[in-house]
Amino acid sequence: MVDDSTRKTLSNIPLLQIRAGPREKDIWVQRLKEEYQALIKYVENNKQSGSDWFRLESNKEGTKWFGKCWYMHNLLKYEFDVEFDIPVTYPTTAPEIALPELDGKTAKMYRGGKICLTDHFKPLWARNVPKFGIAHAMALGLAPWLAVEIPDLIEKGVITYKDNC
């Protein structure tokens, strides 16, 4: 199910060990530390390989995440807002990543711009609780979704390039 490139990407993202969600206030801070370390490592790896494609930050509690992601298509950079909340049942439940400005533009999306990850990503996440975290959700959830959906939306004329100069 996982190709060699994805397997290599995954092997370079640290696995998490602490099983805690926002409800476990005492150990949630430790889980957040692991999350940030994994995200930093993933972003560093992406930069080194020339495939830097997102920026994320969170609120103080680490329960709301937001930022930008981008996809290069025909040498043009398509940029989107990305956001998600950490579910109270995290890490058992994966975050639902949303690209609000694409809401309603593809069938592979739920209300509010939440991308569809049901068939491929969620079973993989479930098998890897608590080892997978936000970096894994970006690598195995959002990245492949962008790679499939954005070129299709561009081809159909649903989204167009915006010059940000």
Curated annotation (Swiss-Prot):
Entry keyword annotation includes Metal-binding: no
CDD domains: UBCc_UFC1
One GO BP annotation of this record: protein K69-linked ufmylation
Record: active site: C116
GO CC entries: cytoplasm
Pfam families: UFC1
SUPFAM superfamilies on file: UBC-like (SSF54495)
Molecular functions per Gene Ontology: UFM1 conjugating enzyme activity
Keyword DNA-binding: no
Keywords tagged on the record: Ubl conjugation pathway
Gene3D superfamilies: Ubiquitin Conjugating Enzyme
Protein's job: E2-like enzyme which forms an intermediate with UFM1 via a thioester linkage.
Family note: Belongs to the ubiquitin-conjugating enzyme family. UFC1 subfamily.
Protein name: Ubiquitin-fold modifier-conjugating enzyme 1
UniProt organism field: Drosophila virilis (Fruit fly)
